[in-house]
């Protein structure tokens, strides 16, 4: 009976150790995914800002052309 108890405790202990290792790897993967998502979001906002600047310049150029035509 003592042999069965020791075997059972050993199996449970090894199971808990492997479970904790899996949880640790899972948390690390989630952190990596969060970092990648944050980096992608930053790149997207930079692209939006760059596009917004271009649109402002184009609108400003057309606005100044319209003012020149009104003066003539």
From Swiss-Prot:
Q: Which residues form the propeptide?
A: 23-49, 69-72
Keyword Membrane applies = yes
A biological process (GO) of this protein is: killing of cells of another organism
Q: What processing steps or modifications follow its translation?
A: C-terminal amidation enhances antibacterial activity. This increase may be due to stabilization of the alpha-helical structure at the membrane interface.
Name one matching Pfam family.
FSAP_sig_propep
Q: A GO molecular-function term, please?
A: lipid binding
Q: Which organs or tissues contain this protein?
A: Expressed by the skin dorsal glands.
Record-linked InterPro entries: Frog_antimicrobial_propeptide, FSAP
Please classify the protein's predominant subcellular localization into one broad category.
secreted
Q: What spans are recorded as compositionally biased (Basic and acidic residues)? A: 38-47
Keywords assigned by UniProt, alphabetized: Amidation, Amphibian defense peptide, Antibiotic, Antimicrobial, Cleavage on pair of basic residues, Fungicide, Lipid-binding, Membrane, Secreted, Signal, Target cell membrane, Target membrane
Q: Which GO terms describe its cellular component?
A: extracellular region; membrane; other organism cell membrane
Which residues are recorded as modified (Leucine amide)?
A: 65
| Subcellular compartments | Secreted; Target cell membrane
On whether ATP-binding is a keyword of this UniProt record, the answer is: no
Quaternary structure annotation from Swiss-Prot or TrEMBL = May be monomeric or may oligomerize as homodimers or homotrimers in Gram-positive and Gram-negative bacteria mimetic membranes.
Question: Which family is annotated?
Answer: Belongs to the frog skin active peptide (FSAP) family. Aurein subfamily.
Query: What extra comment accompanies this record?
Result: The primary structure of the mature peptide is identical to that of aurein-2.5 from Ranoidea raniformis (AC P69018).
What's the protein called, per UniProt? Aurein-2.5
- Give the organism the record lists: Ranoidea aurea
């Amino acid at each position: 009976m003592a042999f069965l108890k020791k075997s059972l405790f050993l199996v449970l202990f090894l199971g808990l150790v492997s479970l904790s290792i899996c949880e640790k790897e899972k948390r690390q993967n989630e952190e990596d995914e969060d970092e990648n998502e944050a980096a992608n979001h930053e790149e997207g906002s930079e692209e939006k800002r760059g596009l917004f600047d271009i649109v402002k310049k184009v609108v400003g150029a057309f606005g100044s052309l319209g003012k020149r035509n009104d003066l003539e």
